[in-house]
């Protein structure tokens, strides 16, 4: 939850400063609740300390849910400085769409919770969730990014639709699902009919803005899968992509070229 909340700050090239924690614990005796609160706070503090972000308050409550519910409100400060001499770029056709991390966490956890895939597959997912977007956040201001979003609960395509709807030039995107990195176990889970709880909602929200250039495939379901601490998706100028990739490689940040900008008005074409 800590890394999940930080992704919004990182996606706008900002530095997290302070956080408020909201925590609901299942009903239990006071000793167990105190222990759980301490463990959650220690785990969150470890994440926020990496970003030099202070947890300076919050609220705790007891609820009827059997699982804890936790969230953070994070305040950040922009790392961008005004530079009147810097060349101004606008999003245009054939600019490059990049994704930094694997997707499929919703499918993996749904498959495990329903005993349809082995719990072994959660290992890589938890590693990515624990690492978060810390490394990218450290160097984001060095990159010439035209537009960026984090990939979380609404799934990849809904976040990408949000990305292009910000652009006044009425652009669209072409994406290649086979180029999208996915976690081990995702294909196995999809073959067994696994869907995450938010899949239908995400699909119904996006589908009228999606154009398929081919027959739909089962692997396309990853496009609508909700993510927890997903990576970042961003657009870079085509003529500068090698320069941007060199910066990412230098700082050992994962990146995958998954598509490009087209002239479709707020629509995504699936190839």
What is each of the regions a protein language model found here?
Residues 1, 53, 58-60, 72-78, ...:
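Fold-independent oxyanion-binding glycine-rich loops
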Residues 1-16:
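Active-site cofactor/substrate anionic-group-binding motifs, chiefly glycine-
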Residues 2, 37, 41, 129:
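Aromatic/hydrophobic pocket-lining residues that form the small-molecule binding cavity
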Residues 15-117, 260:
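Glycine-rich anion-binding loops of enzyme active sites
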Residues 28-54, 61-70, 142, 153-271:
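Glycine-/charge-enriched secondary-structure boundary and capping motifs
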Residues 72-85, 120-141, 215:
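Active-site glycine-rich loop that binds ribose-phosphate moieties when present
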Residues 109-125, 251-254:
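Short, compositionally biased
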Residues 119-126, 146, 198-202:
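Adenine-nucleotide phosphate-binding core of ATP-dependent small-molecule kinases
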């Amino acid at each position: 939850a800590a890394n999940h909340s930080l992704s919004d700050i990182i996606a706008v090239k900002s530095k997290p400063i302070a956080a408020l924690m909201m925590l609901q614990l299942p009903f239990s005796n006071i000793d167990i609740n105190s222990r759980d609160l301490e463990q959650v706070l220690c785990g969150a503090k470890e994440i926020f300390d990496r970003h030099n972000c202070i947890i300076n308050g919050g609220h705790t409550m007891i609820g009827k849910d059997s699982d804890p519910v936790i969230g953070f409100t994070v305040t950040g400060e922009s790392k961008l400085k005004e530079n009147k001499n810097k060349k101004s770029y606008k999003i245009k056709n054939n600019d490059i769409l990049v994704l930094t991390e694997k997707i499929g966490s919703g499918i993996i956890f749904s498959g495990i919770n329903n005993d349809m895939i082995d719990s072994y597959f959660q290992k890589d997912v938890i590693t990515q969730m624990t690492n978060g977007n810390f490394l990218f956040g450290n160097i984001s201001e060095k990159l010439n990014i035209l537009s960026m979003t984090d990939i979380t609960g609404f799934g990849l395509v809904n976040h990408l639709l949000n990305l292009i709807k910000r652009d006044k030039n009425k652009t669209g995107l072409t994406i290649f699902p086979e180029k999208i990195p996915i976690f081990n176990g995702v294909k196995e889970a999809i073959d067994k009919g696994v869907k995450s709880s938010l899949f239908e909602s995400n699909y119904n929200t996006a589908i009228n803005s999606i154009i398929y250039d081919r027959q739909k495939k089962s692997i396309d379901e990853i496009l609508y899968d909700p993510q927890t601490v997903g990576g970042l998706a961003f657009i870079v100028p085509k003529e500068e992509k090698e320069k941007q990739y060199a910066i990412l490689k230098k700082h050992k940040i994962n990146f995958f070229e998954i598509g490009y900008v087209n002239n479709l008005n707020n629509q995504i074409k699936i190839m």
